[in-house]
Amino acid sequence: MFLRSSASRLLHGQIPCVLTRSVHSVAIVGAPFSRGQKKLGVEYGPAAIREAGLLKRLSRLGCHLKDFGDLSFTNVPQDDPYNNLVVYPRSVGLANQELAEVVSRAVSGGYSCVTMGGDHSLAIGTIIGHARHRPDLCVIWVDAHADINTPLTTVSGNIHGQPLSFLIKELQDKVPQLPGFSWIKPCLSPPNIVYIGLRDVEPPEHFILKNYDIQYFSMREIDRLGIQKVMEQTFDRLIGKRQRPIHLSFDIDAFDPKLAPATGTPVVGGLTYREGVYITEEIHNTGLLSALDLVEVNPHLATSEEEAKATARLAVDVIASSFGQTREGGHIVYDHLPTPSSPHESENEECVRI
């Protein structure tokens, strides 16, 4: 399609017609970290998402990008389990401390920060780093799992199933301090969190959700209410009439495994493509998205190259739809419409291709 730009000179002097974009300043942070759990391969998630075309997609949407690259986390050679169960606590603590500094820098610079994991233990660092400059933030946690076990209730010992327990102020009398975690300052309260997509919640986690009045929408609620009503209630709970930053923490296993097979803890009966993208489209429409985690893409767990690529492409769609990509196509936003050219300007006519 072509637009005649010469006509705009009649409306705006000699300034050519400009098709302005809805500009977001977006920081990209790769976090190739896997020690929040025991399966190899999730550290290759950032590379897979990059190879699936994330930066090009965001650029086409008009985003101004600052790429921090893929971080290199400090190795912790001696990292014994806590309580003979919780694995790699020092590695997780130090990696999140380093990640929090980068996210904090990005947010303080005016960027919406996209962090590509890596496992979901990284949300400790991204949320703390975000909260340093946006202390009134709220969290939308899209996941098959609640990730709110404590080190004393976990069965697996994996910290990627515990990150929120370290962040919620009201839980701190139930959470022991792990080695490497002394720097952590809890920054969330239950009214500031909403879960979407839950379908594998352990008994202690269910106890926490109920007794601390944390809002959640399981897949059963999504089936019953529909995703539109779920998002309306989410925004009513978190935002209401306030304008506050949103931190979206999105685990790719929120989707049904048929869509996202390359992940470490798949659970049947997950979000459809349409439901998942509707969530991010609606968050974008608020204009309040300030940080986004996309985690748990694990190319090594795919049974074929196509499965790995499909999961990474889905991750790109989640991120892109959070920054303006719609299922109608990514739109360039007009600041005005052109009018027919004057006869004497026709020979200088310029066309802009969209």
From Swiss-Prot:
One short Pfam name that applies is Arginase
Quaternary organization? Homotrimer.
Tell me the residue numbers annotated for binding Mn(2+) 1: H120, D143, D147, D251
Q: Where does it reside?
A: Mitochondrion
**Listed name of the protein:** Arginase-2, mitochondrial
- Family to which this protein belongs: Belongs to the arginase family.
GO molecular function, one example? arginase activity
Upper lineage: Eukaryota, Metazoa, Chordata, Craniata, Vertebrata
Swiss-Prot/TrEMBL catalytic activity:
L-arginine + H2O = urea + L-ornithine
NCBIfam families according to UniProt? rocF_arginase
Q: What does this protein do?
A: May play a role in the regulation of extra-urea cycle arginine metabolism and also in down-regulation of nitric oxide synthesis. Extrahepatic arginase functions to regulate L-arginine bioavailability to nitric oxid synthase (NOS). Arginine metabolism is a critical regulator of innate and adaptive immune responses. Seems to be involved in negative regulation of the survival capacity of activated CD4(+) and CD8(+) T cells. May suppress inflammation-related signaling in asthmatic airway epithelium.
Question: What gene is it encoded by?
Answer: Arg2
Record-listed Mn(2+) 2 binding positions:
D143, H145, D251, D253
User: Per the entry, which co-factors are needed?
Assistant: Mn(2+)
**Broad EC category:** hydrolase
Q: What is its EC number?
A: 3.5.3.1
Q: Where is the transit peptide?
A: 1-22
What SUPFAM superfamilies does the database record attribute to this sequence? Arginase/deacetylase (SSF52768)
Superkingdom, according to UniProt?
Eukaryota
User: Which InterPro entries does this one have?
Assistant: Arginase, Ureohydrolase, Ureohydrolase_dom_sf, Ureohydrolase_Mn_BS
